[in-house]
Amino acid sequence: MRLSDTDIEEWLSKKKLVIQPYPKKQLINGITVDIHLGNKFRFFYDHTTSCIDLSGSKEKIALDLNKIVSCETIFSKKEPFFLKPGALALFSTLENITLPNNLVGWLDGRSSLARLGLMVHVTSHRIDPGWHGNIVLEFFNAGKLTLVLTPGIKIAALSFELLSKPVLRPYNSRNESKYKRQNGVVPSRIYEE
C-alpha cells in the first residue's frame, strides 16, 4: 500500500518517517514529497581510462573508479552546474531521509525535467527500509542542450510503500551495506561486493 499525502503528513508528524529539512505542506501532494537538489556533486572525467572491467579484481576496479570520478565538490547556494548532453554526474539531495523498517521509498524524476532530457536516476530508485542518509542522484543528460542546475531546485519526488511486516535485515543494520549513513555524494562502491 502506497502512502497518501495524508498518511505521509501523519508519519512525518509522528516521526515514523523523517525528512530533514522538514518538508513544507505544499511539497506533499497526492502520494509524493518533492525533494531538492543539494549542493554536493561529483563529475566524471573524460578519457582517463578506456574501460572498467567489472569482472576484474576489486583493487583494479577501485583504481579505475578513482581515475574517472572527481572528488566531492561543494557549490555555493546559487552557483550553477552545467550538465552537457551525454554527461553523467552524481549529486546528493538536500534532504536527509530516515525510513523505518516497515517502509520502502521510491524515487521518481519529475516529468517536466524528463521532457528536457534529464534523467535523475539511472536505475536505482528504491530506498530500502532502514535507510538513513542523503540520496545520491545519478544525473544523465539525454537531451540536446546543456542543462543548468542550481542547488535548491525541485529535482525529484519520493513516494513510500508500507510493507506487510518490518524487514528482518534493515539497510543500516547490515554489515555489508555499502552506502549506510551516506552523507554527501558517495561514488560507486561496486568493488566492495
From Swiss-Prot:
Q: In which pathway does it act?
A: Pyrimidine metabolism; dUMP biosynthesis; dUMP from dCTP (dUTP route): step 1/2
User: Molecular function terms in GO for this entry?
Assistant: dCTP deaminase activity; nucleotide binding
UniProt-annotated catalytic positions: E138
According to its UniProt record, the EC number is 3.5.4.13
What does the entry give for GO biological process? dUMP biosynthetic process; dUTP biosynthetic process; nucleobase-containing small molecule interconversion
Residues noted as binding dCTP in the record, renumbered to the chain: R110, S111, S112, L113, A114, R115, D128, V136, L137, E138, Y171, K178, Q182
User: Which keywords label this protein?
Assistant: Hydrolase, Nucleotide metabolism, Nucleotide-binding
Q: One Pfam family, short name please?
A: DCD
Gene3D superfamilies, per database record:
2.70.40.10
The record's function comment reads: Catalyzes the deamination of dCTP to dUTP.
The entry assigns this protein to a family as follows:
Belongs to the dCTP deaminase family.
Describe its assembly: Homotrimer.
**How is this protein named in the record?**
dCTP deaminase
Q: According to the entry, what is the taxonomic lineage of the organism?
A: Bacteria, Pseudomonadati, Pseudomonadota, Gammaproteobacteria, Enterobacterales
The primary gene name is: dcd
